[in-house]
Amino acid sequence: MSTLFLAWRNVLRNRRRSAITLATIAVAAMAVVMLGGYVAATIKGLETLTVRQVGHLQVMSRGYLEFGRANPARHALRDYAPLAGRLRADPQLAPLLHVVTPTLQVQGVAGHFASASSSTFSAAGWVADDRARMLAWDGLRLGTPPLPTALRADRPDDGVIGVGLAQLLDLCDALAIADCVRAPAAVPAAAAAIDADLAALSRQAREAGPAAPAAGAVVVDLLAAGASGAPNIVRMTATRAERQGVRELDMVHVGLPLALAQRLVFGTGAAGASALVLQLEDSARLDEARARVAAVVHDYAGDTLEVRTFAEVSPSYNQVVRMFRTLFGFVSLLMAVVTLFAVANTVNMAVSERTGEIGSLRAIGLPRARIRRMFVLEGGLVGAFGAVLGVALAVVLAGGLINHAGFSWTPPGNITPVPITIDVQGSARLCLGTVLAMTLIACISSWWPARRAARLEIVEALRHA
């Protein structure tokens, strides 16, 4: 009779104890798989959001991430159009690319001089159509709806501001913002003096600017240091206020067309960008695309440019990913300990109850190694069946209940609720790894009791009552 068959029959001898141990392991495996599926789905959602905002890759002047915000004109890509054309036309890159578009980051002072108010801003200039395509990216097939954008190609002077910035500029009524916090009525003297200086520049911008805004439009004047160091000012029509997920960002956010941002930084008729943003069709080919982009960029500009990934441009992505993976690792460790003690206790009790039987088996010539193997297999069988049951329960609960229940939560930095999903069916390696790990842990926890059983002396075991 085979050792495996003996182990299986011994598992069935005490069905109640085996069932309790199996249920414990199943719950532990289900917890690991469901948490792992939730972490996988959350990371995919975070990657989708990050890639929509900043793309997969960015080509920029070397050192821009460290020093570019202080002087965007100095670190700008002045002649980005030929490079963008090369990247789009490259036979290896063309099938991988979804969007290639320039962006320009700029900081300065925003003013609404009708209300004698001003505040600092941080703006990003985008090509309207390219931005809409970026915000619709769903390369991970999550079914996430496209994010809205207020930028329009036929409205070159229109942009959006954060709700916090709108409050600082006293635009609550003008932009019809609900739950808007009103600014204090009194204006400090120093601020009034600064506003007077900015008002003079605003008048110059109105006189030198293009067509006047439509009647009733909400006009915000944006002031920033130009390429020559002298201040430039442009007039932007704020079409709406968009609430940002982070308060500090909400109080400085401005989104505007690329041409308007270029006019603010470089003056009329000049062009430049902070970076070329590349969004891929598939995130899985990021390393391949980065290597090829780096080669094309080096051939074009030598070592003056560098290629950065979205994780480097947005460091918070890796921080959140590490946090979730650490949480998953901690819970997995706890479930492993539960499995370890549950199986060890079951096998220990089996050894104690069957001491006489062990003596009989040894007396008829069964070697110590086979005794040890039999008890290890008992623990392994309970662990394997419990893990398989737990994975099956996780698949049923996640796919049939939780993913269709409409549960949602609002992550930090978001303003809209995100559906709670558990990606179990797309995590085959997680399911297989859980079964193998639980089985291995069960075998390891059975080894010491099995060793004790195998080391029993035949005479002592037979005399055991």
Task: Please place each PLM-identified region on the residue numbering.
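Hydrophobic, regular-secondary-structure patches
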Residues: G36-S122, D129-R155
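Short helix-loop junctions at transmembrane helix boundaries
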Residues: T42, M323, V388-T434, W447, ...
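N-terminal Sec/SRP start-transfer signal
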Residues: M1-V33, E47-T48
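Transmembrane alpha-helical interface segments in multi-pass membrane proteins
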Residues: N348-A350, T355-I402
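Short cytosolic juxtamembrane segments of multi-pass membrane proteins
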Residues: R452-A465
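Basic-flanked hydrophobic alpha-helices used for secretion and membrane insertion
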Residues: V160, G164, L168-L305
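Internal alpha-helical transmembrane segments of multipass membrane proteins
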Residues: A23, R325-T346, A384, L393, ...
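Peri-transmembrane interface segments
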Residues: Y38, T42, E248, D282-F341, ...
